[in-house]
Curated annotation (Swiss-Prot):
Tissues where this protein is expressed: Expressed in developing and germinated seeds in the chalazal region immediately adjacent to the site of penetration of the radicle through the testa.
Protein name (Swiss-Prot/TrEMBL): Probable polygalacturonase At2g43860
Organism (species): Arabidopsis thaliana
GO biological process terms held by the UniProt record: carbohydrate metabolic process; cell wall organization
Active site: D225, H248
Catalytic activity: (1,4-alpha-D-galacturonosyl)n+m + H2O = (1,4-alpha-D-galacturonosyl)n + (1,4-alpha-D-galacturonosyl)m
Subcellular location: Secreted, Cell wall
Primary residence: secreted
Signal sequence range: 1-26
């Protein structure tokens, strides 16, 4: 007897397909993923790195929005890298009720440039929680002149990412920068707290580089370096309602370290309180040839309290001697200072040290009143051009506007 095998194959294939569909429906990816379910321990001593990565892999594979829960407790993790290039691009929220802590031995995470790194992700949000990088021992190593100290790891990094939200997060004791936004678009950072010792080296609070449409709001930052720094290639950055101190202020730069370098365009810094910082609002560029630029910058509605350099443009920036002897090639233009008041901890409250090669142009000051706590405040300026209205101290390089009413 001859059987028609084709008649058997088709029903069998349909049965297998039906079974696969039923299995997938019976075990859908849940919308909420608790890291405890993947082996994480909230005791601060067991390594939970693999558990966090496992939870991410499941969320990444979901075609629907998912939330990763980090409950109360202390979760010890090493270097975490969350890749997004193979995700289905559904929104992922990470809600942290407890603390994520790094190992006490700083060398464990310092072997990498990043402690917690999100790479090529889209629609990722982080809410609440504490990141404790336990960087104090590395700071001591560096401050004591140790030659074998590693550079250190940045605590939280987003690179090549889009539509990112960080809300209510606290970052403490970072080895290096606390929060880094690199080569990313549409980023909102709100209500974060950053804390590190004022002598902690290179611990910028929030650093933005090569990124576009970044909003930083309602945050308190006290650290050993810039509270917020805006690096090359950044555009459309909005900073509002910030308390900065201790720290080195809010900086555009440093720029011009490389000869071929993107510039910074369209930055607004508004409603900021500087408390005992080394600088207030600063633009810093290296004294060397470069095609970089800083333009269309607004600093407004700012209070200074015992700030060493409330307003400063430093186009001869240099960290370590010997310093370059060239003039800076970075072009600084269209910078507006408006409604800035308070006290300077030094005699020179306004320092505009611009490049001879490319003088600053379009510098506008309006309603600026800075007084020195020791003696009458002064302004020092070189190679700066622009206008001033109602400015104390008198800034001779800026023409006084005549207001006709």
């Amino acid at each position: 007897m001859v059987y028609n095998t084709s008649c058997l194959i088709l029903p069998l294939a349909l049965i297998i397909l039906d079974f696969t569909l039923i299995s997938s429906l019976a075990h859908p990816i849940p919308s909420t993923l608790n890291v405890l379910s993947y082996g994480a321990k909230p005791d601060g001593s067991k390594d939970s790195t693999k558990a966090f990565l496992a939870a991410w892999d499941v969320a990444c594979a979901s075609a629907n929005p998912t939330t990763i829960i980090v409950p109360k407790g202390r979760f010890l993790v090493g270097n975490l890298v969350f890749h997004g290039n193979e995700c289905k691009q559904a929104p992922i929220s990470i809600r942290i009720a407890g603390s994520i802590v790094a190992p006490e031995d700083f060398r464990i995470i310092a072997s990498s440039k990043h402690w917690i790194w999100f790479e090529d992700v889209t629609d990722v949000s982080i809410y609440g929680g504490i990141l404790d990088a336990q960087g104090t021992s590395l700071w001591k190593c560096k401050n004591n002149g140790g030659h074998n100290c590693p550079t250190g790891a940045k605590s939280l990094v987003f690179s090549g990412s889009n539509n990112i939200k960080i809300s209510g997060l606290t970052s403490i004791n970072s080895q290096k920068f606390h929060i880094v936004i690199d080569n990313s678009n549409n980023v909102n950072i709100d209500g974060v707290k950053v804390s590190a010792d004022e002598n902690s080296p290179n611990t910028d609070g929030i650093h933005v580089e090569s990124s576009h449409s970044v909003h930083i709001t309602n945050s308190r930052i006290g650290t050993g370096d810039d509270c917020i720094s805006i690096g090359p290639g950044s555009t459309n950055v909005f900073i509002q309602t910030i308390r900065c101190g201790p720290g080195h202020g809010i900086s555009i730069g440093s720029l011009g370290r490389a000869e071929e370098e993107q510039g910074v365009d369209n930055v607004t810094v508004s409603n900021v309180d500087f408390m005992g910082t080394n600088n207030g609002v600063r633009i810093k560029t290296w004294g060397k040839d470069s095609n970089s630029f800083a333009r269309n910058i607004v600093f407004q509605h700012i209070n200074m309290k015992m700030v060493k350099n409330p307003i400063i443009i430093d186009q001869h920036y240099c960290l370590h001697k010997p310093c370059p002897k060239q003039e800076s090639g970075v072009k600084v233009s269209n910078v507006r200072y408006e409604d800035i008041h308070g006290t300077s901890n030094t005699e020179v409250a306004v320092l505009l040290d611009c490049s001879k090669e490319k003088p600053c142009t379009g510098i506008v000051m309006d309603d600026v009143n800075l007084v020195s706590v020791h003696r009458p405040a002064q302004a020092s300026c070189d190679n700066a051009n622009g206008s001033a209205n109602d400015v104390v101290p008198f800034t001779p390089c800026l023409k006084r506007e005549i207001i006709i009413t």
